[in-house]
């Protein structure tokens, strides 16, 4: 039998507050349970960017704080100012003449649309593979001739891939390195978002627009639909409510969020399901990725 002294010690232990083992990092967390409460009535916990928060109060508060910071942070796209202009690079390589370059530049200026590489292809002065190789040299990255057909199993939201005209090429599980192919230019903001959400490193490469189009068409056919797009929702509080609702419905254990240009990407993971939520500031937002048809070249 337990002695009165031992019973008293057990009573003290079960009533004791356990601040040292409280996992929630929120400074405003009101949950400071005793050991008994932790054993019989544990507080639900969801990991946000790897840190466990009490759900819903602490997580919603921290999520709202992060979304408010994201909505006010300046949106800057990384630009390599040291890059040699594409036309001059191709001219120095002997891949076109100065007259051909001048004609393409005049058309670009006159129409106010299209990239110089697109105009060179439109005029028949360069092939897509030649332009892709020059772009790869310009961005100091590899060029790939084709995008593997197995990219359909990728878990990156299809809408995000289509928006930034990119496709996954290869993933190394040992190094946790994801190689992403782009057409036209490298979107570093998209790469940074992928690293945050997928917990991996990324390496960019370049390929032709035709290869990206083909890869995205294959992905669209195999798209499982595990993503939701919310257009015209920019209020951080409304976004927080939507995300919290999905967390509760899915009984999620982890959530990650990242800003990517005009898009907010939220990735919610449960025991068996994974859902991607995308929030666009503009309703009916036009995608960057389209099969481009430039105006007919005319200098008259």
Regions found by a protein language model. Name each.
Residues 4-9, 15-17, 123-196, 233-263, ...:
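Polyanionic, low-complexity intrinsically disordered segments
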Residues 6-23, 44-48:
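Short, flexible, mixed-charge glycine/proline-rich loop motifs
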Residues 12, 40-41, 72-81, 102-110:
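Short, recurring structural edge motifs at helix starts
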Residues 21-29, 54:
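Short cysteine-rich clusters marking metal-coordination/redox-active sites
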Residues 28-39, 58-62:
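Cys/His-rich microdomains that often coordinate metals
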Residues 36-51:
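Short linker/helix segments within small regulatory modules
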Residues 50-72, 278:
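Short metal-binding segments enriched for Cys and/or His
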Residues 214-231:
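Short, low-order "capping/linker" segments at domain edges
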């Amino acid at each position: 039998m337990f002695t009165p002294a031992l019973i008293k010690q057990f009573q003290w232990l079960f009533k004791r507050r356990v601040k040292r083992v409280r996992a929630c990092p929120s400074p405003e967390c009101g949950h400071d349970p005793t050991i008994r409460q932790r054993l019989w009535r544990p507080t639900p916990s969801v990991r946000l960017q790897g840190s466990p928060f009490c759900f819903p109060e602490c997580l919603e508060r921290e999520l709202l704080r992060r979304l408010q910071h994201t909505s006010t942070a300046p949106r800057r796209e990384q630009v390599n100012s040291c890059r040699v202009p594409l036309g001059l690079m191709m001219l120095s390589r002997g891949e076109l003449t100065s007259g051909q370059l001048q004609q393409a530049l005049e058309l670009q200026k006159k129409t106010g649309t299209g990239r110089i590489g697109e105009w060179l292809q439109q005029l028949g002065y360069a092939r897509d593979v030649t332009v892709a190789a020059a772009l790869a040299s310009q961005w100091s990255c590899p060029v790939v001739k084709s995008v593997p057909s197995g990219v359909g199993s990728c878990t990156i939201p299809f809408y995000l891939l289509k928006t930034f005209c990119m496709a996954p090429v290869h993933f190394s599980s040992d190094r946790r390195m994801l190689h992403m192919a782009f057409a036209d230019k490298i979107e570093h903001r998209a790469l940074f978002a992928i690293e945050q959400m997928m917990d991996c490193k990324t390496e960019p490469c370049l390929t032709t627009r035709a290869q990206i189009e083909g890869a995205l068409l294959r992905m669209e056919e195999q798209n499982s639909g595990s993503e939701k797009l919310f257009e015209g929702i920019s209020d951080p509080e409304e976004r927080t409510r939507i995300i919290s609702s999905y967390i509760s419905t899915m009984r999620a254990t982890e959530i990650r969020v990242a800003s990517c240009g005009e898009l907010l990407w939220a990735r919610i993971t449960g025991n068996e399901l994974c859902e991607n939520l995308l929030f666009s500031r503009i309703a009916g937002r036009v995608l960057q990725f389209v099969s481009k048809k430039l105006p007919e070249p005319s200098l008259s």
